[in-house]
């Protein structure tokens, strides 16, 4: 099974969308193996968004992500990275398909409710950045045999 990292951003937390967003992934058959609410400090934000350092939107992005708590989570399932990205929709909510998370709840490209890893390699890096090994659970679900066999 593949794992991916998801983060409900400050606008999603402030607007009370956490439960709805988590429910979408559970209803799709993904297993939540890590979940916590955190306040991201500047150092962690800079590591997370390091690829954007030097770009004009870097400082506003770091300021935004550190402005309020976020919900960090790791989900597990078949094609977790690709399926989660499909469920989230395009980064720009104006271009996101109706019914996707960003298409439904996103306001603009800066307030698009959720972040998800864009590749299996990014997922590994982001999971390690936000979770220690003992914060990730290994468990089976009765549902697994219906979804994955």
From Swiss-Prot:
Its cofactor is Mg(2+). Its EC number is 2.7.4.6. GO terms for biological process: CTP biosynthetic process; GTP biosynthetic process; UTP biosynthetic process. It is found in: Cytoplasm. The keyword Signal does not apply. SMART domains: NDK. The keyword Nucleotide-binding applies. One of its GO terms (molecular function) is metal ion binding. The active site is at 115 (pros-phosphohistidine intermediate). Major role in the synthesis of nucleoside triphosphates other than ATP. The ATP gamma phosphate is transferred to the NDP beta phosphate via a ping-pong mechanism, using a phosphorylated active-site intermediate. Homotetramer. This is Nucleoside diphosphate kinase. It comes from Pelotomaculum thermopropionicum (strain DSM 13744 / JCM 10971 / SI). The lineage of its organism: Bacteria, Bacillati, Bacillota, Clostridia, Eubacteriales.
């Amino acid at each position: 099974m593949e794992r991916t990292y998801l983060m409900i951003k400050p606008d999603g937390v402030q607007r009370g969308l956490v439960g709805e967003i988590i429910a979408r992934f559970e209803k799709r058959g993904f297993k939540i193996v890590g979940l916590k609410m955190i306040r991201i400090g500047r150092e962690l934000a800079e590591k997370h968004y390091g690829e954007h350092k030097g770009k004009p939107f870097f400082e506003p992005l770091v300021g935004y992500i550190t402005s309020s708590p976020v919900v960090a989570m790791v989900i597990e399932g078949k094609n977790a990275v690709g399926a989660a990205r499909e469920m989230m929709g395009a980064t720009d909510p104006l271009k996101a398909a109706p019914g996707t998370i960003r298409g439904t709840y996103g306001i603009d490209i800066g307030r698009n409710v959720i972040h998800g890893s864009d590749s299996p390699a990014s997922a590994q890096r982001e999971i390690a950045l936000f979770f220690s090994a003992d914060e990730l659970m290994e468990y089976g679900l009765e549902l697994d045999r219906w979804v994955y066999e």
